[in-house]
Amino acid sequence: MNKLTLLLKFLIQAFMWFAIASEFVSLLYEIFHSLKENYFLGLETHKILVKVLNVIIIYELFTTLLIALEERRIKLILIIDTAMIFFIRELLIVLFTYKKLELSEGIASALILGTLGILRFLYLKYKIDVE
């Protein structure tokens, strides 16, 4: 690896850890603010869950980027996992905000998650990567 690639890798890792740290600070602020104001009565657990899933998504995205930079190829499993986590996060946001989920939206969500699950299974069985 040349110096430019190493510098780019270092900057990407630094930005990743900064983004993760800022999400954790936001998470801790949310918890302490709820404790101070409502003594856990108003603690909205879906906000905490969404913030934790944000951290996982940030980590997965940057891991994919770093592996693509290092190996000069993209691991399909990382993209599928990130897409699944992101989609589950979006579903949880809709469900925990008590919005009405239409039947067509529910079927579409199930089909998308099912397709991603099948893709993940096929990847694990056949180990296909994109170069």
From Swiss-Prot:
Keywords: Cell membrane, Membrane, Transmembrane, Transmembrane helix. InterPro entries: P_starv_induced_PsiE-like. The keyword Membrane applies. Its main location: membrane. The chain crosses the membrane at residues 7-29, 49-69, 76-98, 102-124. One of its GO terms (cellular component) is plasma membrane. It is found in: Cell membrane. It is a multi-pass membrane protein. This is Uncharacterized protein aq_293.
